[in-house]
Amino acid sequence: IKSIVIPSTLTKFGNTGLNEFLNCTRLERVEIYAPIGNNLTYLNTSYFSGCTSLKEVVLPDSIVELGNTAFKNCVSLENIDLSGIREIGNNTFEGCTSLASVDLSSVNTIGNYAFKGCTALTEVYIPDSVVDMGTSVFLDCDNLQSLTVSDGNSAYRLGSAGELLNYDGTQILYVPASATGEYVIEQGMTAGDYAFAGTGVTKVVIPNSMTV
């Protein structure tokens, strides 16, 4: 099966609504217009995980949350409409190496490692709506050169080197791959897990206030 359309007339799909398309390696396109499981707002854990040929997905308007690992290792997925999505789970798009752009305009929460290894991403815009991001959201996004945060965002901002900081500037969350040379961590600041992973930074100066 390379393509499937689930119409709005369908009232039940599987017994649990979990992992229905897990590891369907030949599936290229899916259009879902029917409720998923018993929850109309949630795309379950690992729903499309391992669908290595999947290029396009059309989700029902009711879906506002993408479960953990929902699209993990969908290596052919180039883009997905996230309009209306408010929460992205842990590792949701991990290993989606063809995913070239993401629209986070309606997203409030992004889980741990959500876009880990999305090597086709070159730039990401974080809008006002995003107020809660987990650990190492963009870990191993080796080609992510530009990260921009809306001036109106109340939770995050950029530092002078283009790094992602919490709003009060006390924690370094992510340093883009384009960063090179020496980086000085200011007094009173901390660094999140893997904050400098994959960068060209050759030296990090750690202040006395920081424990390693």
Which residues are covered by each model-predicted region?
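Structural signature of tandem-repeat unit edges
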Residues: 1-12, 24-42, 52-65, 75-87, ...
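Consensus positions within tandem repeat domains that build extended binding/scaffold surfaces
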Residues: 17-22, 44-49, 67-72, 89-94, ...
